[in-house]
Swiss-Prot record:
This is Dual oxidase 1. The chain crosses the membrane at residues 588-608, 987-1007, 1025-1045, 1069-1089, 1135-1155, 1164-1184, 1190-1210. The gene is bli-3. Changing residue 246 to D: In e767; growth arrest, severe blistering of the cuticle, incomplete molting and mild shorter and stouter body shape. Resistant to iodide toxicity. Reduced catalase activity. It comes from the Eukaryota. Residues 22-587, 1008-1024, 1090-1134, 1185-1189 are extracellular. GO terms for biological process: collagen and cuticulin-based cuticle development; cuticle development involved in collagen and cuticulin-based cuticle molting cycle; defense response; defense response to fungus; defense response to Gram-positive bacterium; hydrogen peroxide catabolic process; nematode larval development; post-embryonic body morphogenesis.
Length: 1497
């Protein structure tokens, strides 16, 4: 019999393909269904809309499901629950039941999830025996709405239309798939066959094509996709029956291909494949349309005879068909499958568990193992013998209670899902759908009269649930109730028949269509003769005697009837449903990851503190890196009783110098390496000498510290080369102390403690400053003079018990200890101890000088000068006192001239030149024109300002009337705010624009992700979190782009010379850099925290949810990403964590405390910005949430940044030789080096300098203002030693000066722009320099006089310059005095006016100031206006400048000007005072305005 069947098939193939071949240019039917209908190419294609055969029924008419309808689960329990095992009265076999699933999967897949996921909840009745066994009433069955066309669902005229992801044609997509890549993965490309794994079976899914692979509910875990067979439909491995049909059709294709190849060996692989595919499709079309459909609907219902192809007929799957009618076969599916052995004997197999049938609920998504265990033959034979369930409303529990679901809800209800699918698709109610198909409406009683009679209570309950209104009855419920023993009811029959008719008539490639030229009439008749039985026999080892003629039905007399009607009795029980969260096992990783991220900045801060403390602990700092105790000196060894040792003296944290320590008898001397005493300490009889030294082996690099304390003076802190030197040093101290009975106390301490306790000269000075501030606050009764951080009252023992020495008093007054004025004042004041002065003693005398009447002050001065106590003062003693004051003030006149000036002053007061003594009356006459209350100086606050007589002559340039000076009220908040806005209007505008752009970018992205991005599931999963983080990302990208522009120093320098400089305050580029950095830190923090929350939500999502969230990513079907995956296994996660770490490192080491103490670390960590930008670019590349946009933000700034660096390299000058260097007072360093020929700059600009001789970390350079004029041949810099690098440079220069060795070479970059370079843009300019801030004006003033004294004067716009120099004492700036002398000598008459404000007298004695005024006034009057202090014509002022009065004077002097430039360089408080003065002056709208440019150090 087998041979007869093979012969028959061979004849069939010979008949069909014997007379012609398939040409290469012949049209092959597409896999995706497109262009089947040439007029409507998308009809029936994969991804096309479902066909709407009746109007949609949504509660809002657009897309909303009617939530007022009864619970789908409750309907399922009432109507579809029942006993299984009732045989089908028509004799339908299980083959028909499972083949209906093949047909459904062949033509539709409309339950795919849509993005965003729309999950509805099906309410479970209380105490449901499957889903609510504990009677909690909280369980809800999840239902996910189907994928739909995004172009629909937007209005009443365009209701939501779901999508069919399969083709509507019967075209073999169940076997081949719907895409070319999918088909290619299935083919062997040999002889037209589909690829095989083992013979007769397709390969397993090692290539991981996207087959459906949900977690089998019976094991409740994800399984590897490698175990699944690869076939055309992704759902084919769902159950054993479905997979068996898939394998049958797979073999049918290869069987056909073999036959065709045998007949036509010359055909190509593609020709054979397409020919075999044609026959497979044709045979499926015939079996489905003419065998299956009548079998399902009943023999009396058949499709009409085929007439012709009808291109106007839409083949699309209708909503009513897919969501209701074609779900009727659920009622005939049995709970288990019989397994029948091959052979002539009628034997059935028990499954491996000993159960008589294979339970369906226990084998979801395990079909491949069943097939391999029992074979396709046994499954097919079992289904052929097994009678299906009866055609009724009952659905077995394997489908109704235990069908597979997602992992978080492992079992679902297929009936409830079908009801919800109809509602989701907008299928109209039962009666309305009947009217659409020309059927009369039904009532509750007539819907199924037999059912109503038998189950009246159920119908009544149903009626109650729908409120008695049958107009709301779901079509699926009504259609299922219509059915009976003869199959589906009339509504479902009409829908199914209509659907298959449209599919057939609208298919251009239908096998009966004569116009497509595929088959002849004879070939069509031959195809009509093919049955499913023929295909089974051709593809299995089943003999024809084992199968009935019609495998869809089992009739009496057919071979091997079933032994029993399968029901749930005696079968393997179903594993109950389980609920779980996808967050399981993620808690620990998530919590510890967040803790780790939070600890990153703390760790960075800890590392920074460790670096700083370690340097302190081992006494290591950059100032002593290159210094050792091994240096040459004039007296290296001990001479006689003199002990000597080389050491390093630790003066302050960033300054260490080489010294020679010598101990002779009871004196310890600190000397310079080549001679010269720096300090002497004498040990007194009975003195307690305290010594602290480092613990043994404190540092292998430098050796131990020694601290020697001294009362009323700063400690001596030295570092010896070794512990051996330390031992010898201590022995010498003990020996010196033993001779005078002094007690020596020696203790060892850790370096960090020792250095922190050391009262260095700097720390002692801070304490003295506090001492004097508090005393002045008491004396002047002015709380503003107090330390803002120290609270002082009369009970503060720490201050009251403080004493100062004569040397410290002299230093505070700016005098020397041997100064006559100091000696006399100290002798008169120190009453309890001749060596020290207490706080109360100092306060008493201070009050006398400040608050006492003028008469009492003169008496005090008279007592100081009356050394003999005879109530008269020796003329020469008073002369010596005045001479000491002049010497302190730095008077630049000889002693003879001073004596002449002194005699002139006395003569002016009426004292005879012959008088040897002066009486008190002479003193009174001498100071008669001095006010009783004279201000200390010109304070910044401008309160109660009245120029004194002495000041008036010195302040004649400022003699203006100020209406508000005498009656100025305290500044209100509004006044301060308005002054700030007036001063910083450009800055405020720029910052406002910056903030506005940040907010616009943030809210644009926020709005987009919160309200617009509906095609993703972001909003449902993450809520506002994703909107916040994406908004922060947009603003952060902008900040990171902008921050690059703020450091393009070379480009900024070029822009300063353009009109842009008038609108953008480039002076504040670094300040703006910090503002942008703070905003970036805020956005980055918000972004990071937001995503930490977001990824928690991501970790709770199913695979479908993740597919919607991350549409650009692909996850394996057996892979559910954990939180550790997101954090540590994705580019986004890893780069995100790396970015947090890098950003924390950069920001932490950019804190001022680390910049000051660990500058190298700051420089190095800022190089991580390169990695920061690279990581940020990588961060967005995976496109998890959106396409990366960071590159669009930064591409322009990066290009400009690179151009800026190229310009910088072009302006990089290496190994410049220092030709001259000096160490000036106040720790100022002067260097002069050769100017490169091509180096051009403007006065007021600055350069960055580094030196290869100073061992610094990579790329360290420091900025300094240029002191030389553009016309000079050499470059000059004046550098204040304040940090590690400058102190190290100072030490190197000292070494070179002492040893005569070459100066260190330097590298230079620049020049860079500065606000001071704009002075030439104004006709009137005001320049204010304070401290080392006068450096840029050394260049500017020289440039000014050289320009104005040359023939090109007419090219210089500037016509008047006011220069104000604010300094504590000009003695420390002799170099600048020389510059001013040179400027005065060359300046054109009237172009430059200079004022010098000496602030050291502020908080000092007004008596001293008064005497200086008197001498200065008389000297100027007799020496052509030259100052006796400076030798300059510049006016001297004792106190601080009153900028408000000065600016008002300038406005009155230059009314014709519209704008006047103000340039300042100095400390913050100076610039703030100038800015405030400018703001006040700018309120005068009819006067010139002031434009302030400043530099702060």
């Amino acid at each position: 019999m087998r041979s007869k069947h093979v012969l028959y098939i061979a004849i069939l193939f010979s008949s069909i393909f014997g007379g012609k071949g398939i040409q290469q240019n012949e049209e092959f039917q597409r896999y995706d269904g497109w262009y089947n209908n040439l007029a409507n190419s998308e009809w029936g294609s994969a991804g096309s809309r479902l066909h709407r055969d009746a109007r949609s029924y949504y509660s809002d008419g657009v897309y909303s499901v009617n939530n007022s309808l009864p619970s789908a689960r409750e309907l399922s329990d009432i109507l579809f629950k029942g006993e299984s095992g009732i045989p089908n009265t028509r004799g339908c076999t299980t083959l028909l039941a499972f083949f209906s699933q093949v047909v459904a999967y062949e033509i539709m897949q409309s339950n795919g999830v849509s993005c965003p996921l729309e999950t509805l909840k099906i309410q479970v009745p209380l105490c449901d025996n499957v889903f609510d066994k504990e009677c909690e009433g909280k369980t809800e069955i999840p239902f996910t709405r189907a994928k739909y066309d995004k172009a629909t669902g937007n209005g009443l005229n365009s209701p939501r239309e779901q999508i069919n992801e399969r083709t509507s044609w019967i075209d073999g997509s169940f076997i081949y798939g719907t895409t070319q890549p999918w088909v290619s993965s299935l083919r062997s490309f040999k002889q037209g066959r589909l690829a095989e794994g083992v013979p007769g079976y397709p390969p397993l899914n090692n290539p991981h094509i996207p087959l459906n692979n949900p977690a089998p509910p019976q094991v409740h875990r994800l399984m590897s996709p490698d175990r699944l067979f690869m076939l055309g439909d992704s759902r084919v491995n769902e159950n054993p029956g479905l997979l068996s049909f898939g394998l049958i059709l797979f073999r049918w294709h290869n069987y056909n291909a073999n036959q065709i190849h045998r007949e036509h060996p010359d055909w190509t692989d593609e020709q054979i494949f397409q020919a075999a595919r044609r026959l497979v499709i044709a045979s499926m079309q015939k079996i489905i349309a003419y065998d299956f459909v009548p079998g399902l609907l009943g023999e009396d219902v058949r499709l009409s005879n085929y007439t012709k192809y009808m291109p106007h007929v839409p083949p699309g799957i209708s909503h009513a068909f897919g969501a209701a009618a074609f779900r009727f076969p659920h009622s005939i599916v049995p709970p288990a499958m019989l397994l029948r052995k091959r052979g002539n004997k009628c034997e059935f197999r028990t499954e491996v568990g000993g159960y008589p049938a294979l339970r369906l609920c226990q084998n979801w998504w395990n079909a491949q193992d069943i097939v391999k265990e029992y074979s396709v033959d046994e499954i097919i034979l079992g289904m052929a013998s097994q009678i299906a369930e009866r055609d009724d409303n009952i659905v077995v529990e394997d489908l109704r209670d235990y069908i597979f679901g997602p992992m978080h809800f492992s079992r679902l209800d297929v009936v409830a899902s079908s009801i919800m699918r109809g509602r989701d698709n907008g299928v109209p109610p039962y009666n309305e759908l009947r009217r659409t198909f020309g059927l009369a409406p039904k009532t509750w009683e007539t819907m199924n009269e037999d059912f109503y009679k038998k189950h009246t209570a159920k119908v009544e309950k149903l009626k109650e649930l729908y409120g008695g209104n049958i107009l709301y009855l779901d079509a699926y419920v009504g259609g299922m109730l219509e059915g009976g023993e003869n199959g589906p009811g009339e509504l479902f029959k009409e829908i199914i028949k209509d659907q298959f008719t449209r599919i057939r008539d609208g298919d251009r490639f239908w096998f009966e269509n004569k116009l497509n030229g595929l088959f002849t009439d004879e070939e069509v008749q031959m195809i009509h003769s093919i049955t499913l039985r023929d295909i089974i026999k051709a593809t299995t080892d089943i003999d024809e005697t084992m199968l009935q003629k019609d495998v869809f039905f089992f009739k009496e007399g057919d071979p091997c009837p079933q032994p029993f009607q399968v029901n749930t009795t005696g079968l393997e029980p179903c594993v109950p449903f389980m609920q779980s969260t996808y967050w399981t096992d993620n808690d620990t990783t998530y919590v510890f990851t967040l803790i780790g991220l939070a600890c990153v900045p703390l760790i960075c801060y800890g590392i920074g503190r460790y670096l700083v403390n370690r340097r302190i602990a081992i006494g290591h700092n950059s100032a002593c890196d290159s210094l050792t105790t091994d240096f040459a000196n004039d007296d290296c060894g001990a001479k006689g009783d003199i002990y000597g040792v080389n050491a390093l003296e630790w003066l302050q944290e960033e300054y260490i110098r080489q010294v020679r320590i010598e101990i002779e008898n009871t004196t310890l001397a600190v000397k310079k390496p080549r001679g010269g005493i720096l300090r002497k300490i004498r040990f007194e009889t009975g003195q307690k000498i305290e010594l602290f030294h480092s613990m043994p082996n404190p540092s292998a690099m430098h050796g131990p510290f020694v601290l020697l304390s001294q009362k009323n003076n700063h400690h001596l802190v030295i570092r010896l080369s070794s512990d051996r030197d330390l031992s010898k040093f201590l022995d010498q101290i003990r020996q010196a102390a033993s001779g005078i009975n002094a007690e020596v106390i020696i203790k060892d301490e850790e370096n960090s403690i020792l250095l922190s306790q050391a009262i260095t000269k700097e720390r002692r000075q801070d304490r003295l400053d506090l001492f004097f501030r508090e005393a002045y606050a008491k004396a002047f009764n002015d709380s503003e003079l107090q330390d803002s951080e120290t609270s002082f009252d009369s009970s503060n023992d720490d201050i009251l018990n403080e004493t100062i020495s004569r040397e410290e008093l002299a230093s505070a007054m700016g005098m020397k200890a041997n100064n006559e004025f100091v000696k006399r004042m100290f002798a008169m004041t120190a009453k309890h101890n001749e060596d020290s002065l207490s706080f109360n003693e100092f306060l008493t005398v201070l009050r006398e000088f400040v608050n006492a009447p003028q008469k009492q002050k003169l008496q005090t001065l008279f007592k100081m000068c009356d050394l003999e106590g005879k109530n008269k003062v020796l003329r020469k003693d008073l002369a010596e006192l005045v001479k000491s004051l002049n010497q302190t003030a730095g008077v630049h006149i000889t002693e003879s001239v001073q004596l002449r000036l002194f005699n002139e002053v006395l003569h002016y007061a009426g004292v005879s030149n012959d008088a040897k003594y002066l009486t008190y009356d002479d003193f009174n006459a001498l100071f008669s024109d001095i006010p009783d209350k004279q201000p200390v100086g010109l304070p910044f606050n401008r309160k109660n300002y009245q120029p004194s007589i002495g000041e008036t002559s010195s302040l004649n340039s400022f003699a203006v009337v100020d209406r508000s000076i005498n009656s100025s009220a305290p500044l209100t908040l509004i006044h301060k705010v308005s002054a700030f806005l007036e001063t910083y209007r450009q800055h405020v505008f720029i910052v406002f624009c910056f903030v506005a752009i940040n907010l616009v970018l943030f809210f644009e992205r926020f709005w987009h992700y919160r309200y617009m991005a509906e095609n993703r599931d972001l909003r449902r999963v993450m809520g506002a979190g994703i909107a916040i983080t994406r908004g922060a990302a947009g603003a952060l990208s902008f900040c990171m782009a902008l921050i690059l522009l703020t450091v393009c120093r070379n480009i900024i320098t070029l822009l300063r010379e353009t009109v842009i400089a008038q609108y953008i305050p480039f002076d504040s580029a670094i300040a703006f850099h910090k503002i942008v950095a703070l905003f970036a830190a805020f956005w980055a923090t918000l972004h990071t925290v937001g995503h930490c929350v977001n990824f928690y939500h991501v970790g709770t999502q199913s695979q479908e949810g993740l597919a919607c969230l991350f549409q650009e990513a692909f996850f394996g079907s057996n892979f559910l990403p954990s939180i550790s995956y997101w954090f540590f296994s994705t580019i986004t996660g890893l780069t995100g964590i790396a970015l947090v770490a890098v950003m924390c490192i950069i920001y932490v080491f950019a804190l001022p405390c680390f910049i000051k103490r660990a500058y190298h670390a700051f420089r190095l960590t800022h190089l991580l910005n390169i990695a920061f930008y690279a990581l940020t670019l990588l961060h967005g590349l995976p496109k998890l949430l959106d396409s990366p946009k960071f590159g669009y933000y930064v591409v322009g700034p990066i290009v400009l940044f690179v151009i800026d660096r190229i310009i910088g390299l072009m302006q990089y000058y290496k190994k410049l030789e220092i030709v001259n260097a000096e160490i000036l007072p106040s720790d100022i360093i002067y260097i002069e080096y050769r100017r490169p020929r091509e180096f051009k700059y403007k006065s007021g600009q600055w350069v960055t300098v580094s030196s290869p001789s100073i061992s610094c970390t990579f790329n360290e350079s420091h900025a300094f203002s240029i002191a030389s004029s553009p016309q000079d041949e050499n470059m000059k810099l004046y550098i204040k030693a304040v940090g590690p690098w400058t102190w190290k440079l100072r030490s190197e220069l000292i070494r070179s000066l002492n040893t005569g060795s070459p100066f260190p070479l330097i590298h230079m970059k620049g020049p860079y722009g500065d606000g001071n370079q704009e002075w030439m843009d104004y006709e009137v300019a005001i320049m204010v320099g304070a401290g080392i801030g006068v450096t840029p004006y050394a260049s500017t003033l020289v440039d000014l006089v050289q320009r104005t004294s040359s023939d090109s004067f007419h090219r210089v716009r500037c016509r008047k310059v006011y220069f104000l120099w604010v300094c504590s004492t000009h003695k420390n700036y002799e170099w600048f005095v020389d510059v001013l002398k040179n400027v005065e000598d060359q300046a054109r008459s009237g172009i430059l006016e200079t004022h010098i404000f000496v602030t050291q007298t502020f908080h000092k004695f007004d008596l001293r100031t008064t005497m200086l005024y008197i001498c200065e006034k008389h000297f100027r009057a007799t020496n052509s206006g030259i100052s006796m202090f400076t030798g300059l014509h510049a006016k001297n002022h004792f106190g601080r400048p009153n900028f408000k009065a000065f600016f008002q004077f300038i406005q009155s002097e230059h009314k014709e000007q519209s704008k006047i430039g103000v340039f300042s360089c100095g400390p913050v408080n100076l610039n703030e005072s100038i800015a405030e003065g400018c703001a006040d002056a700018n309120r005068q709208r009819d006067a010139p305005s002031f434009a302030h440019r400043f530099e702060t150090f």
